[in-house]
A protein has these predicted regions:
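Non-catalytic, mobile gating and regulatory segments of ester bond hydrolases
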Residues: 1-119, 123-145
Length: 145
C-alpha cells in the first residue's frame, strides 16, 4: 500500500474531475496523466470513469451535478441503508453505486493483476467509499474530495 502524498492527492483529484466529462474529453486528458484508456459507465444518474494503464485501474465516481434533479435527490436521500459490506450507509449513495456496480466489477475483474484505486468528489466520494467497502482487500487506496 502506498502512502498518501500531495502529488497523489492532486493526481486523483484530477481523475475525479474527469468523471464529470464525456469519454472523449476524459480520454484526451487522462493520457497526460499516464493512462491509455478511459471508459465511461453511466446508468441513469450514476456515472463513473474507468482509467487504465499498464499497472493500475482507477474507478472515478462522478459527484453531484447541481442542475440534475436526480443527483440532488440522491444526495438528500440520506436515511440509513444496511449494507452487508459496510454497515449502515447513506441510502442515496448506495442506490447510485448499485446502478453501475455490475459494469464496474466486470471492468475490475478484467484487469486482475492491476492495482485498483478508487476516487470521487461529493456524491462520487460517498460512492467511492461504498465501492471500496464492497471490494475490500482488492483496493490499493481510496481518495475522496
Amino acid at each position: 500500500m502506498q502512502s498518501t502524498t500531495r502529488e497523489l492527492a492532486i493526481h486523483y483529484a484530477k481523475l475525479s474531475s474527469y468523471a464529470y466529462m464525456d469519454a472523449d474529453s476524459a480520454s484526451s486528458l487522462c493520457r497526460q496523466l499516464g493512462y491509455s484508456k478511459a471508459k465511461l459507465i453511466s446508468n441513469g444518474s450514476a456515472q463513473c470513469m474507468i482509467f487504465t494503464n499498464e499497472q493500475d485501474i482507477v474507478v472515478a465516481f462522478r459527484g453531484t451535478e447541481p442542475t440534475q434533479l436526480k443527483d440532488v435527490l440522491a444526495d438528500v436521500k440520506a436515511w440509513k441503508h444496511r449494507s452487508k459490506h459496510a454497515g449502515w450507509v447513506h441510502d442515496g449513495f448506495y442506490d447510485e453505486v448499485k446502478k453501475v456496480w455490475d459494469e464496474v466489477v466486470a471492468c475490475i475483474n478484467a484487469e486482475p493483476t492491476k492495482k485498483l484505486y478508487i476516487c470521487g468528489h461529493s456524491l462520487g466520494g460517498g460512492m467511492s467509499m461504498i465501492a471500496a467497502a464492497r471490494l475490500q482487500d482488492r483496493v490499493e487506496a481510496v481518495y475522496t474530495y
